[in-house]
C-alpha cells in the first residue's frame, strides 16, 4: 500500500523561509510607535485589501494623536526648573571616608600599599632589597647539585 502524502516534509523549510526572518511586532512599523494596537491589527487587513483605507486610518489617527497632545499640554502646567548642584566632590569624600574606616578600609589600604610597592622606581626598590642581609644558605639535600656562581 502506498504511503499517504498528507504528512510531507519536502520543501517545508523553503516555505518557512520564504518570508524571511521577521522583526518583532513592536519593531515592525517604526513610523507608528505611539499607535494603539487595535489600529495596528486593523492595518494588517487594510494592507491586504485596500491601501486607501489604510491612508484614511493613518490620517485620522494622526489627527487624534495631535489633538490629544494639545489637550494634555493645556492641562499640564509647566514646572519651574530647579538649578541642580554639581555632585562631583561627594564621591571623593565618601571614598576617603571608606578608606579611613577601621574595618571596611583594611582591604582598600592593603591594595593601595601594594600598588605603591609595585609602582616604586627600580633604584629605590633595589636599595631596599640590598639593605637586608642575605640569609644563610640551607644545607643542600643529598644528591642535589651545588649552586654555581654566575660570572660577573
Swiss-Prot record:
Chain intervals with Low complexity compositional bias: 121-152
N6-acetyllysine sites (modified residues): 33
Pfam short name (any one): Ribosomal_L29e
GO molecular function: structural constituent of ribosome
Modification N6-methyllysine, positions: 5
Gene Ontology cellular component terms for the protein in this record: cytosolic large ribosomal subunit
Residue numbers spanned by region Disordered: 1-32, 119-152
Keyword Disulfide bond: no
UniProt modified residues of type Phosphoserine: 31
Keywords annotated in UniProt: Acetylation, Cytoplasm, Methylation, Phosphoprotein, Repeat, Ribonucleoprotein, Ribosomal protein
Biased composition (Basic residues): 1-26
Gene Ontology terms: biological process: cytoplasmic translation
Compartments in which it is found: Cytoplasm
Function of the protein: Component of the large ribosomal subunit. The ribosome is a large ribonucleoprotein complex responsible for the synthesis of proteins in the cell.
Similarity comment: family membership: Belongs to the eukaryotic ribosomal protein eL29 family.
Assembly, per entry: Component of the large ribosomal subunit.
Protein name per UniProt: Large ribosomal subunit protein eL29
Species assigned in the record: Bos taurus (Bovine)
